[in-house]
Amino acid sequence: VGFKXGVXEYKLTYYTPEXETKDTDILAAFRVTPQPGVPPEEAGXAVAAESSTGTWTTVWTDGLTSLDRYKGRCYHIEPVPGEADQYICYVAYPLDLFEEGSVTNMFTSIVGNVFGFKALRALRLEDLRIPPAYIKTFQGPPHGIQVERDKLNKYGRPLLGCTIKPKLGLSAKNYGRAVYECLRGGLDFTKDDENVNSQPFMRWRDRFLFCAEALYKAQAETGEIKGHYLNATAGTCEEMIKRAVFARELGVPIVMHDYLTGGFTANTSLAHYCRDNGLLLHIHRAMHAVIDRQKNHGIHFRVLAKALRMSGGDHIHAGTVVGKLEGERDITLGFVDLLRDDFIEKDRSRGIYFTQDWVSLPGVIPVASGGIHVWHMPALTEIFGDXSVLQFGGGTLGXPWGNAPGAVANRVALEACVKARNEGRDLAAEGNTIIREASKWSPELAAACEVWKEIKFEFAAVDTLDRE
């Protein structure tokens, strides 16, 4: 074969509309906005090329390998309804392009380079189909939903959490005191804020000690198992593991990590440590909106959520639908199912582009957190169901009577909603009535209801489904 130098159009090699995808391929759905004058086939093929074997010109060394075996292929393109110049381009990647058990390598390949590509005005990775053959190379969540329930001995209801506020500035002793009050009042978990690591006003070791003391005291008083998400996120992997080891030595049930700022390599290491040592792992998604909030550019959160399930985590923040942070209901429920269920059918009405089979990888519990309070409890119980953690930071610590009564109010509201649901009542229609009835016999709940009766965060979601 004679080598022919020069710049060839990408679509000649990488746009193959008739190609059949393999069961072992990783499939990607990209939302592509080409520059004016660039046809969608060329743009789609360019994405496939630049995220797999291609480069800008033909190279001599192409002859030393089998491009047909290794190249990504753009196998289908569809216009986005309601958008003049946007297309969904589907790309299939051969499995051999990826290192086993490495989310880091998967992302470096698929989204590493191509997003700066000049022929594209914008590019967003909307969804990935991870084949069972690749999933089986990952450990996944350290324990998963069922094992967590068994460890905590809590069934048949969502779990309750609270982020300790003010997030920065408390001393370790006062921080521990707030933890104790919330847990004693009836919460299951309290949480380090994502930016609490080890700062001058509160070093990590002191915080770990006082929080452990708080949760043992609360356990003894309530007869329930309690947890505090001790944030092990640190500047180096070694320091992170050191903190996790200390948490294990204290005998606490759960640690926490910021998986996007900490990075997938660190996160996967921590997840392996947690499984080997019986620690649950709570994952915070700090920095996600930088990546996922723009509708036409970046990576959709459902992809970051899938990646986390592969890398490993037992809880992950997944939006509230009703609070202060972004999240359209159908889209949120789509990736909540991707986190929890074993098999998820393709469903474009919920933003799910591919059928995903997790082949028994443990599930992740979605965490609803951010601007929620007792009046939201019926909606949250209905939307998220039992396998979830509902986190009320300000909604606990902002109760007028203090932290413990704030916790009592949340627990009473939750138990009332679960009871009503189990009796067959419609939480969506009767939610306010259910909360009002419960507040008649719980003065703590009545006080909380009074404070937050008018609070709403009324903004339209930025990231919406495409509709005709």
Swiss-Prot record:
One of its GO terms (biological process) is reductive pentose-phosphate cycle. Gene3D superfamilies: Ribulose bisphosphate carboxylase, large subunit, C-terminal domain, RuBisCO large subunit, N-terminal domain. The record marks 324 as: Transition state stabilizer. Substrate binds at residues 113, 163, 167, 285, 317, 369. It comes from the Eukaryota. Mg(2+) binds at residues 191, 193-194. The active site is at residues 165, 284. PROSITE patterns: RUBISCO_LARGE. It is found in: Plastid, Chloroplast. It is an enzyme of class 4 (lyase). One of its GO terms (molecular function) is magnesium ion binding. The disulfide bond which can form in the large chain dimeric partners within the hexadecamer appears to be associated with oxidative stress and protein turnover. Pfam families: RuBisCO_large, RuBisCO_large_N. Its cofactor is Mg(2+). One of its GO terms (cellular component) is chloroplast. Binds 1 Mg(2+) ion per subunit. The modification N6-carboxylysine is found at residue 191. The basic functional RuBisCO is composed of a large chain homodimer in a 'head-to-tail' conformation. In form I RuBisCO this homodimer is arranged in a barrel-like tetramer with the small subunits forming a tetrameric 'cap' on each end of the 'barrel'. PANTHER family: RIBULOSE BISPHOSPHATE CARBOXYLASE, RIBULOSE BISPHOSPHATE CARBOXYLASE LARGE CHAIN. HAMAP family: RuBisCO_L_type1. Heterohexadecamer of 8 large chains and 8 small chains; disulfide-linked. The disulfide link is formed within the large subunit homodimers. RuBisCO catalyzes two reactions: the carboxylation of D-ribulose 1,5-bisphosphate, the primary event in carbon dioxide fixation, as well as the oxidative fragmentation of the pentose substrate in the photorespiration process. Both reactions occur simultaneously and in competition at the same active site. This is Ribulose bisphosphate carboxylase large chain. The lineage of its organism: Eukaryota, Viridiplantae, Streptophyta, Embryophyta, Tracheophyta.
